[in-house]
């Protein structure tokens, strides 16, 4: 399955997304639908907002991937500053068994801070 910015995909069913990472109850509903469809894996885009708002708290991800970080989610309704944004993004790597990191990104050290994978 897939949960992402554009849509969620559960088998042959495509569901338009309202948020990159839905509210926690909706993520659980999607996981159940995927299991009911016989799916045994999901690729999920986890936003910094989802991490900040605990939408995926309690989940253990097999693999987390960090590609890059740009200052595009700073503002009144997102993150107060870049440091907060980077911290929230880094929270994913406290919930993963394996982390894959872009070693060329200038913010790598901040993203890896506190990682457990």
Predicted regions and their residues:
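Short beta-strand-centered segment that lines the nucleotide-binding/catalytic pocket of NTP-utilizing
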Residues: 1-10
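Flexible beta-alpha connector loops of hexameric P-loop NTPases
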Residues: 14-24, 72-80
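Switch I (G2) and immediately adjacent beta-strands of P-loop GTPase domains
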Residues: 30, 34-35, 45
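Acidic, Mg2+-coordinating active-site environments of NTP-dependent enzymes
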Residues: 36-37, 63-117
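Switch II (G3) loop of P-loop NTPases
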Residues: 39-49
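Conserved helix/coil segment N-terminal to the catalytic DExD/H
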Residues: 50-57
